[in-house]
């Protein structure tokens, strides 16, 4: 079941492929951000299609850093990234600072998790 979902994700967003059938780049990131990241991927793809760059788009690294998403991308031919894509990534990196990494609810910008998810650790 999970492999089928991963195949569908990779077919839709090839840059989520990390070379391992059972996992995608999405699986390496906090669960609470999955919807946010998929929304970002949808917007990125819409722009990539306009510029005929879907096959050239790569994510070099994606991670949680300082309570927010850090998304490092490039084009495989090293041509400049269209500003529209850079703007999309920046928008979602900022939004991620307000989304709980565990559940996806709103949270303070200076915390990794919302108060509900943080409660067991207090």
Task: List the model feature ranges, each with a label.
Residues 1-86:
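Long, charged N-terminal interaction/targeting segments
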Residues 65, 110-111:
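Ser/Thr- and Asn-enriched, surface-exposed coil loops between beta-strands
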Residues 87-91:
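Short, intrinsically disordered linker segments that flank or connect zinc-binding domains
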Residues 95-98, 108-109:
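Flanking scaffold residues of small Cys/His-coordinated metal-binding clusters
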Residues 100-103, 114-117:
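Short cysteine-rich clusters marking metal-coordination/redox-active sites
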Residues 107-109, 118-121:
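Cys/His-rich microdomains that often coordinate metals
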